[in-house]
C-alpha cells in the first residue's frame, strides 16, 4: 500500500523543486533609464524618475565625456545629437554648457554625472548600473559615495580587477572587452597557472549564447550572467532564461516584492 502511494507523495515535492527552479528571481535593469513615452536610450532625468516610480531597483546610465572632459549621460554623441535635433553634428561632442541647454526629443532633461550622482544619493534603494566608462579613477571622482550601490560594466580585465578591489557592489566583465576571450580562458586556469581576480559576472549580449567559445566555457564553469537587451521573455529559450540572473530591458517591468539583492 505504501509503495503504491509513494509516487503520489514524492510528486508534489518534485513539482515544487521544478517550480522553484523556474521562478528563480532575475533582477531587471532599466536600460539607459528604460522606455519613456515610447523613446529609448534617453538617459534623461525623466527616464530615471519613471524607472524608479515603476519599481526598478537597478537603473543603467551610459556615461561619456563632453568636449571639455566632463562626464555626462548619453549613449553616444551621435545618438545624443540626433535626439536633440543636432544630427548635422554627427558624432561631435558638445561642450558642457551646450549639453545642459539641450532638450532630448524636445522635452527631456539631459543629465551630467553630477546630476546622476545626486539622483541616486537621494534614494538609498536604487542601484546605479554604468555603461561605456569603466575607468576606476573617473568613477571614483564622480561617484565617491556610491560604490556600495554601483554595478559597473568593466571593459578591460585590468579595470575589472581594480574595481573589485575597490569594493564596488558588483562588477560585470563585458563581452565587448577586447581581452574578453583571453581573460575568461585565464580564469579557468587560475588555480594552476595564473594569479588574479576570478571573474564571477559577465555582461553578455543575447547573441552570445550562440558563440561556440561561450558554450565551451559555460560547460567548464558557470558564470553569473547579466544579459542585454531583452524586451520579451519569449525571445529566450527556457534553458537560456535559467542561466540569467540580471536582464537589461527597455520595457519589461519588475514584479513587486521580487527585487531582493542576492
Per-range role (PLM):
Residues 7-14:
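Bacterial N-terminal signal peptides
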Residues 17-262:
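Phosphate-group recognition and catalysis centered on beta-loop-alpha active-site segments
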Amino acid at each position: 500500500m505504501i509503495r503504491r502511494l509513494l509516487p503520489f507523495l514524492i510528486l508534489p515535492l518534485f513539482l515544487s523543486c521544478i517550480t522553484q527552479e523556474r521562478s528563480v528571481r532575475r533582477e531587471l535593469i532599466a536600460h539607459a533609464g528604460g522606455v519613456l513615452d515610447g523613446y529609448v536610450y534617453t538617459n534623461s532625468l525623466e527616464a530615471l524618475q519613471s524607472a524608479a516610480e515603476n519599481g526598478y531597483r537597478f537603473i543603467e546610465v551610459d556615461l561619456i565625456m563632453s568636449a571639455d572632459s566632463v562626464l555626462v549621460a548619453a549613449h553616444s554623441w551621435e545618438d545624443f545629437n540626433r535626439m536633440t535635433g543636432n544630427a548635422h553634428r554627427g558624432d561631435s561632442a558638445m561642450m558642457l554648457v551646450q549639453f545642459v541647454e539641450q532638450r532630448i526629443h524636445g522635452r527631456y532633461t539631459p543629465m551630467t554625472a553630477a546630476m546622476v550622482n545626486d539622483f541616486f544619493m537621494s534614494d538609498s534603494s536604487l542601484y546605479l548600473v554604468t555603461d561605456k566608462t569603466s575607468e576606476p579613477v573617473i568613477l571614483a571622482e564622480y561617484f565617491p559615495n556610491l560604490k556600495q550601490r554601483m554595478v559597473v560594466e568593466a571593459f578591460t580585465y585590468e579595470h575589472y580587477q581594480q574595481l573589485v578591489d575597490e569594493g564596488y557592489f558588483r562588477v560585470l566583465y563585458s563581452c565587448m572587452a577586447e581581452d574578453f576571450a583571453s581573460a575568461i580562458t585565464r580564469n579557468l586556469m587560475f588555480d594552476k597557472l595564473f594569479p588574479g581576480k576570478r571573474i564571477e559576472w559577465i555582461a553578455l549580449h543575447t547573441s552570445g549564447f550562440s558563440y561556440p567559445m561561450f558554450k565551451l566555457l559555460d560547460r567548464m564553469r558557470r558564470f553569473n550572467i547579466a544579459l542585454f537587451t531583452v524586451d520579451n521573455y519569449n525571445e529566450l529559450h527556457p534553458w537560456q532564461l535559467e542561466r540569467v540572473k540580471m536582464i537589461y530591458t527597455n520595457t519589461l517591468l519588475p514584479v513587486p516584492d521580487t527585487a531582493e539583492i542576492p
